[in-house]
């Protein structure tokens, strides 16, 4: 308990190489995906939300949402970090973005990420990669797709989601702002 209180005060290690960048992309994408999805579910379901976790049908929906949101978050953060590196550190190896992205996805099979989602994600990544402007991406709205994915995939009734759209999108963007700030402080290529 006390460790968690002081954890925020401990300086985080610098990101100095591609292996550390890969770990950052994976862990922070997972964090944003989980925190935003479960917070939204808890908010919408109220204090008895835990009771719904016994419902297999509901849990199947949550699991599907979790992986789909995470897959888009991975894409967004991968593109953001490499765009930022290119623009601020003259890092020209943006082709490494695909290598790292695929490595993360391959590792997620051990966490039971569904293969159909992995396959779909690889295709979407390639499509986005073809049209990305590395010089603009990190300065534009880099996390819009993952914000939209939470809105799309959250297992919440459509009539309620429509009322929540702006709040849901903003909650994801605010979480990404924390990650962007941390990345800028930790990167040391």
Predicted regions and their residues:
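Eukaryote-specific, cytoplasm-facing alpha-helical/coiled-coil scaffolding segments in long proteins
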Residues: 61-65, 98-112
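Leu/Val/Ala/Ile-rich N-terminal alpha-helices, chiefly Sec-type signal peptides and the beginnings
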Residues: 1-54, 64
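Residue-level detector of alpha-helical secondary structure
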Residues: 3-10, 22, 98, 102, ...
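Short acidic alpha-helical/loop segments enriched in Asp/Glu that coordinate divalent cations
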Residues: 50-53, 86-100, 113-117
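N-terminal interaction modules that seed assembly of large macromolecular complexes
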Residues: 40-90
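Alpha-helical repeat scaffolds in large eukaryotic proteins
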Residues: 38, 42, 78-86, 102-110, ...
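Helix-driven interaction modules
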Residues: 106-189
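Residues within HEAT/ARM-like alpha-solenoid scaffolds
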Residues: 68-72, 76, 96, 113-116, ...
């Amino acid at each position: 308990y006390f460790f968690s209180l002081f954890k925020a005060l401990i300086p985080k290690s610098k990101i100095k190489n591609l292996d550390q960048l890969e770990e950052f992309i994976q862990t922070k994408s997972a964090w944003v995906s989980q925190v935003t999805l479960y917070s939204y579910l808890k908010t919408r379901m109220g204090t008895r939300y835990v009771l719904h976790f016994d419902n297999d049908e509901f849990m199947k929906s949550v699991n599907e949402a979790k992986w789909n949101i995470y897959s888009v978050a991975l894409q967004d953060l991968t593109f953001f970090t490499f765009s930022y590196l290119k623009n601020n550190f003259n890092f020209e190896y943006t082709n490494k973005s695909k290598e790292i992205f695929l490595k993360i996805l391959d590792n997620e099979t051990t966490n039971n990420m569904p293969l159909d989602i992995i396959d779909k994600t690889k295709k979407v990544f390639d499509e986005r990669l073809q049209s990305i402007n590395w010089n603009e991406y990190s300065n534009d709205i880099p996390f819009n797709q993952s914000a939209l994915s939470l809105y799309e995939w959250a297992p919440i009734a459509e009539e309620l989601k429509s009322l929540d759209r702006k709040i849901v999108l903003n909650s994801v963007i605010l979480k990404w702002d924390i990650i962007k700030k941390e990345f800028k402080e930790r990167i040391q290529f």
